């Protein structure tokens, strides 16, 4: 599953891009619900990774 590291700047770019709404705002960083995230199966790229300016969304 994907997860967001502490380098998250809380910019909010990723949340609206998630096709399965697995991303939500945490206390200090955005978080990905591992049970919901399907890593954008069937799409050309992982939507959140593609838009993250901090490059902090990584494979878990």
From Swiss-Prot:
The keyword Repeat applies. InterPro entries: 4Fe4S_Fe-S-bd, 4Fe4S_Fe_S_CS. It comes from the Bacteria. Pfam families: Fer4. [4Fe-4S] cluster 2 binds at residues 18, 37, 40, 48. This is Ferredoxin-1. Its cofactor is [4Fe-4S] cluster. Gene3D superfamilies: 3.30.70.20. Keywords: 4Fe-4S, Electron transport, Iron, Iron-sulfur, Metal-binding, Repeat, Transport. It comes from Chlorobium limicola.
């Amino acid at each position: 599953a994907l997860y967001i590291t502490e380098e998250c700047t809380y910019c909010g770019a990723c949340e609206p891009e998630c096709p399965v709404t697995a991303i939500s705002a945490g206390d200090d960083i955005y978080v990905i619900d591992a049970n919901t995230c399907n890593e954008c199966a069937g799409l050309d790229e992982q939507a959140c990774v593609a838009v993250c300016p901090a490059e902090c969304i990584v494979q878990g």
